[in-house]
Every structure is written in structure tokens, then in C-alpha cells.
Amino acid sequence: FGSLLGICLLTQIITGLLLATHYTADTSLAFSSVAHMCRDVQFGWLIRNLHANGASFFFICIYIHIGRGLYYGSYLNKETWNVGVILLLTLMATAFVGYVLPWGQMSFWGATVITNLFSAIPYIGQTLVEWAWGGFSVDNPTLTRFFALHFLLPFAITGLTLVHLTFLHETGSNNPLGIPSDCDKIPFHPYYSMKDILGFALMIIPLAALALFSPNLLGDPENFTPANPLATPPHIKPEWYFLFAYAILRSIPNKLGGVLALAASILVLFLIPLLHKSKQRSMTFRPLSQILFWTLVANLLILTWVGS
């Protein structure tokens, strides 16, 4: 799935650049600039749908990639793993600031709710939030800086990806048995290149199908209404790929406690290399660990479902 993530990143950067050429980062114009893009720009609708749904596929791939890393003990390549977790955090930040850009209702209120969480930090929280907003509420300065960040972060992700690959190259990749595979090495081309092309095809076909047949399936209908600071949507929720974390956040009555639990649900990945005590690397021959692993997967799916 690493190669698929690379393709996702490339697709997102290309479609994103094309979108940025027509986008206006201003509260009075952002919503209509996106509408203009879908109506008046050649293939603008397609580029936007690919970009919006490409994000979903990016997260599907990264979650499977992490799950596979957990299952096969890839986290024992500590540097690679830690850079990977930082990549995940950067990707989540990018997706969040990107979701705010169309300036629909859910964009505005999502931005308000999530940035407001920083106010739970003792002593400096409120100052931090007002500093992030550039004022006393989510407004034009917020949109402008979010656009700047959304433009910048994917290139940071590209840089981190190269670091990720450099560290991986030090050790070589892992395999399902978790044993050294030096004696089984084969040329990248044609073997791996063919395997990767198959993966690309298997990902691009559903992505194209989603973007062409039901582009709004995963989006929130609230976002077709321009942002209105005076009208709160009945239920504020993020895109599906953040729902598991959002469910954790909302299940804890205390604000700071919820924020800490939300952060911990992602940052726990940093601890995993330290928690590995088995003599075997992968879970292939460890049924008990397999049960726990699949329970974790089921848990995340249930949280995603509950969060919506």
C-alpha cells in the first residue's frame, strides 16, 4: 500500500494545483469560486471530485498500510515507523485545513469546533486559539492561512515520504514471515513494477467510479450551504476518516480529557515499537495477538459508525 499512497499523494498534488489556480481564498468568494470551478472550468467538476474523493482513498490506503505494519511487526524498523506516524499526523492536518477551504457550513463549523479544542490547553489555550484564528472567530484571516497551509503541507508530506523511504532503504522491507529475506531478493523491474501497476489499477478504478457516479456519497450535504456564522448545523461532524477520533473525543464529558484521548488515539502509535515483547516479529503464528489485532480493527470500525 506504500506505492498506492505515493500515487495518492501525486494525484492529490496534481489535482490540487489545478484547483488552486481557480480558487479564491476569501470568505466572500471561496464558496462561489468552487461553484464556478465545477460549472465553468473545463473538467473542473472532475478535478474537484477526484481531489475530494482522492482524500478518502488516501486515508483508506494509509489506514490499511498502518494496519499491515502492525500485523507484520514492521514497526520494529523504528525510524521508518516514527517518520510514518509523523506522516499520518501531517496528512490529517492537511485534510483538516483542506476541508475548510470550500467555506460551506460544515467547513466553517468543523474549523470552529476543532480549532476550539486548543482552548482546552491550560493557561495558553485561549491565546493559542485566537492566534490560530487571527481574530476572535473563524473568519477571513483563518481561511487565508488555512489555504496557505493546505498548499504547503503536501510538499512537507513529499519531503517526509523521501525520509521515510530512505530509512526503509537502510533495512530493506519486511515480509509476512518476519524473517530476513536477503536470499529471496528479486529485481524491482519487471516484478515489483508489475505488482504496483496492478495495485494502481485496482485503486484508480474505484476512485474514478466514485468520482464519476456518486461524487457526493462521502461528503456532508451541509457543505452545499455557504458558511453562516449565525446558524449552527444540527450535527457537526468531520469527514468519515476522522469519525473514529471524533467519537473518542465526544465520548468523554471533560473537554481537556477528550482532547487528550483524541491525541492519544493517534500518538499511541509511537509507543508500539517499545511494547513489542514477542520473540517472533509478525503475527502470522500468534493467534492470540491476531484476535487482539482484529478486535482493534473492529473497534475502529464501530467507533467510525458510532461517530456518524
UniProtKB/Swiss-Prot annotation:
Any Gene Ontology CC annotation: mitochondrial inner membrane
GO biological process: mitochondrial electron transport, ubiquinol to cytochrome c
Residues noted as binding heme b b562 in the record, renumbered to the chain: 51, 150
InterPro entries: Cyt_b/b6_C, Cyt_b/b6_C_sf, Cyt_b/b6_N, Cytb/b6-like_sf, Cytochrome_b_C_euk/bac, Cytochrome_b_N_euk/bac, Di-haem_cyt_TM
Molecular-function GO term, any one: ubiquinol-cytochrome-c reductase activity
Subcellular location: Mitochondrion inner membrane
Database matches in Gene3D superfamilies: Cytochrome Bc1 Complex, Chain C
Primary location: mitochondrion
Regions annotated as coiled coil: none
Superkingdom, taxonomy of origin: Eukaryota
Membrane topology, record value: Multi-pass membrane protein
Cofactor(s) demanded: heme b
Residues bound to a ubiquinone: 169
Binding-site residues for heme b b566, renumbered to this chain: 65, 164
Entry keyword set: Electron transport, Heme, Iron, Membrane, Metal-binding, Mitochondrion, Mitochondrion inner membrane, Respiratory chain, Transmembrane, Transmembrane helix, Transport, Ubiquinone
Keyword Transmembrane helix in annotation: yes
PANTHER family: CYTOCHROME B
Other information: Heme 1 (or BL or b562) is low-potential and absorbs at about 562 nm, and heme 2 (or BH or b566) is high-potential and absorbs at about 566 nm.
Functional note: Component of the ubiquinol-cytochrome c reductase complex (complex III or cytochrome b-c1 complex) that is part of the mitochondrial respiratory chain. The b-c1 complex mediates electron transfer from ubiquinol to cytochrome c. Contributes to the generation of a proton gradient across the mitochondrial membrane that is then used for ATP synthesis.
Family: Belongs to the cytochrome b family.
Name of the protein described by the UniProt record: Cytochrome b
Protein source organism: Ptiloprora plumbea
